[in-house]
Amino acid sequence: MRHSKRTHCPDWDSRESWGHESYSGSHKRKRRSHSSTQENRHCKPHHQFKDSDCHYLEARCLNERDYRDRRYIDEYRNDYCEGYVPRHYHRDVESTYRIHCSKSSVRSRRSSPKRKRNRPCASHQSHSKSHRRKRSRSIEDDEEGHLICQSGDVLRARYEIVDTLGEGAFGKVVECIDHGMDGLHVAVKIVKNVGRYREAARSEIQVLEHLNSTDPNSVFRCVQMLEWFDHHGHVCIVFELLGLSTYDFIKENSFLPFQIDHIRQMAYQICQSINFLHHNKLTHTDLKPENILFVKSDYVVKYNSKMKRDERTLKNTDIKVVDFGSATYDDEHHSTLVSTRHYRAPEVILALGWSQPCDVWSIGCILIEYYLGFTVFQTHDSKEHLAMMERILGPIPAHMIQKTRKRKYFHHNQLDWDEHSSAGRYVRRRCKPLKEFMLCHDEEHEKLFDLVRRMLEYDPARRITLDEALQHPFFDLLKRK
C-alpha cells in the first residue's frame, strides 16, 4: 500500500539545484535590474526573414543576448517564488540527480575540465568531531544528518563512491561504480538521516516502484530506480546514470534554442511519458527543463558563420523524465500550491484546484522555452505572472476570475494591473502575444505554436489532453518515418 501522506519540508524554499550557487537574501538579483531595451539590439525584426531563411539556426539571432542578459536569465530561474512549500524534500534531491548525473555535467560546473577523483564527497569533512554524530568507528554523520563520505568509500559492500554529483538540504547524490554489475556507473542518492526526509524518500520510492514495475523496459521514459537500501539510517536510492538536463544543455550552449526537429522529437517523448503517468492516475506537478534529462548529452560543435560563434548540436534527443518526489495520485491530498513558478498553471495560481491538466500547461511552457532559449514567464510574483499571461495569451476567462478566492489580484472582475507602473512596463517589454515569438512562419513553426497555444489554454477543462496532443499535426513527420 502506498503512503497517502506526504512529508512537507518548510526549510526548502529555493528552486535551485545542488550544483548551482545558493541564491538567496542579499544575493538575489532584482527583477528589474536589467534592461530589456537592449534585447535584440543587433537583430532584425522577425518579419524581415524570408521564407527561405526560416531554418532555425538562421533565425536564432532574435534570441541573441549580451552576456549580462543571459546571466540574468540564468540567475532569475533560481529565484523561486515566496510561499511555495513543496510536499516533499525530493524536489531538490531529484534536481541534484537530474542536473548532475553525468560525467559531462560534473565537468561543466567546475573551473577545471579535469575530474578531481580524490576530492571528498562533502565539505563537511572539515567539520570538527564535535560537530559529528558518531555511530561507529567508520560511519559518521555531520551535524545536519549528512553522511560523511569520500572517494573510495563503499556502500553496502557494492557501490564504490567515485565523486559527488551534488548536495542539498535533503542529502547528496554521488556517482558510484556498481561492483555487483561489472563496474556499471550509477547515481546514488543518499538521504539525510533525519526522520521527515526518510519518510519522504520512502514515499517517492513507492511511486518509482509503481512506475518501474508497470513499465520495466522504460518504454515511457521515466527514470529507472535500480534499487534502494538503508545505509546506517540513510535511505539510498540507486538510479541509472544519465546525461545533462535539457536546461543545462541550453545554458552550456549560451542559451541558444534547440532546432525545431529536435523539439519535435523531445516533445513527443515528453508527452508520451507524462501521458503514461496520467493513465496511471498520477500528476507529476513539477515539470520543467531541469527535470527532462538526456539519456546521453553528446553533441557536435559547428561554427555558425551568421552568428560568428561555435554552437552545439545534439547527437541524440532521447530523454528521460525525473523528479517524482511531488508526483500525486488522484486519490491523494492535493496541496494548494504546486509546480515551479515559471511553469505553474493559472488554476494553481488562482487556487481553483488542479489535476493532470496542470502538467500539460507546464509542457507548453517547456516547449516555448526550447524554441526561444529562455522562459517567457520570468517573474516571481503571482499578479505579475497573471499579467504576463494576459499579455501573451489574452484575458483570463471571466468564469475563472469569478470562482477564485484570490480576490486581491482582481478589481471589478478584471486583473488589477497598472500597465504604466514599473512592473507594467517590465511586462510590456518582456512579453508580447504568443504568435509574435515565432521566429518564422513556415508550416512546422505554425504547427508547433498551435500545439503550444492549445497547451496554454487558461481553462483546464478546455486544455488539450496528452492523448490529443500526441495526435497533433506537429508530430506527423515522426509518424511517417
Swiss-Prot record:
Q: Name one GO cellular component term.
A: nucleus
Q: Give the Basic and acidic residues compositional bias ranges.
A: 8-19
Q: What is this protein called?
A: Dual specificity protein kinase CLK4
Q: How is it modified after translation?
A: Autophosphorylates on all three types of residues.
Under InterPro entries, the record lists: CLK_kinases (IPR051175), Kinase-like_dom_sf (IPR011009), Prot_kinase_dom (IPR000719), Protein_kinase_ATP_BS (IPR017441), Ser/Thr_kinase_AS (IPR008271)
Q: Which gene encodes it?
A: Clk4
What, per the annotation, is the impact of changing K189R? Answer: Loss of function
Alphabetically ordered keywords of this record: ATP-binding, Kinase, Nucleotide-binding, Nucleus, Phosphoprotein, Serine/threonine-protein kinase, Transferase, Tyrosine-protein kinase
In which residues is ATP bound?
A: L165, G166, E167, G168, A169, F170, G171, K172, V173, K189
Xref: SUPFAM superfamilies: Protein kinase-like (PK-like)
